[in-house]
From Swiss-Prot:
Pfam families: PHP. Its EC number is 3.1.3.-. Zn(2+) 1 binds at residues 7, 9, 73, 192. Homotrimer. This is Probable phosphatase CKO_02035. It comes from Citrobacter koseri (strain ATCC BAA-895 / CDC 4225-83 / SGSC4696). Keywords: Hydrolase, Metal-binding, Zinc.
Length: 245
């Protein structure tokens, strides 16, 4: 069990089914110390309004010893790597995940997909690329991993990709993990929970990491401190409430 989960959705994304309170309760039950709420960016049809993300500033940082990070799963919009998280939204959030979603950026050829993903990483606004192993969006995995290491962006291994969505991701995710290993980059594990019951579920991710002998010291989820140091290295101000996590 890893004590950090970096990817989940609440009822604010209306195809998800749990509240912030549900996730806090499940985190306490499972021993999760820190998690990030990452509802879909506003360009998705059922995503929350941009005010939702700006107003996350009213959330407490800690509830019953569980740390809450304010995040988003933004959409990569075009080959220039623009995302639907700008201005006050960027300044209000701790964790910016970005990825491809068909309603916003339709699948293209490998070269175009790769260009868009690398441009998003190069923008300096993205901390994690979500589900880069999605077979609907072929990319040059070696180039993506090298760019991620260069720009200090983590590539996600997404547990949901092996269970509920993006079927056929296994080979790509294995290749992503191996390429990140070779490039000396970071991986982030995400449950991609759309219900609190799956918070912190990484069993399928763990299989992929084991198969490629991925170094544990390059997994962001190992401890709250490791993740927070990574985010601080990318410009996030230290969060005093998390000092004892």
């Amino acid at each position: 069990m890893y004590p950090v989960d970096l990817h989940m959705h609440t009822v604010a994304s209306t195809h998800a089914y749990s509240t912030l309170h549900d996730y806090i309760a499940e985190a306490k039950r499972k021993g999760i110390k820190l998690f990030a709420i990452t509802d879909h960016g506003p360009d998705m049809a059922d995503a929350p309004h941009h005010w939702h993300f700006i107003n996350m500033r009213i959330w407490p940082r800690l509830v019953d010893g569980v740390g809450i990070l304010r995040g988003i799963e933004a959409n990569i919009k075009n080959i220039d790597g623009e995302i639907d998280c700008t201005g006050p939204m960027l300044n209000s959030l701790d964790v910016i995940i970005a990825g491809f979603h068909e309603p916003v950026f339709a699948p293209h050829d490998k070269e175009t997909n790769t260009q868009a993903m690398i441009a998003a990483m190069a923008s300096g606004n993205v901390h994690i690329i979500s589900h880069p192993g999605n077979p609907k969006y072929p990319v040059d995995i070696t180039a993506i991993a090298q760019a991620a290491a260069k720009y200090q962006v983590a590539l996600e291994i997404n547990n949901s990709s092996f269970l509920h969505s993006r079927k056929g991701s296994e080979d790509n995710c294995r290749a992503v993990a191996a390429a990140v290993r070779d490039a000396g980059g970071w991986v982030a594990l995400g449950s991609d929970s759309h219900t609190a019951f799956t918070l912190g579920e990484f069993a399928e991710c763990r299989k992929i990491l084991d198969e490629v002998d991925f170094p544990e010291e390059r997994v962001l989820n190992v401890s709250p401190g490791r993740l927070l140091r990574f985010l601080e290295s990318r410009g996030m101000a230290p969060i005093p409430e998390f000092a004892e996590l």
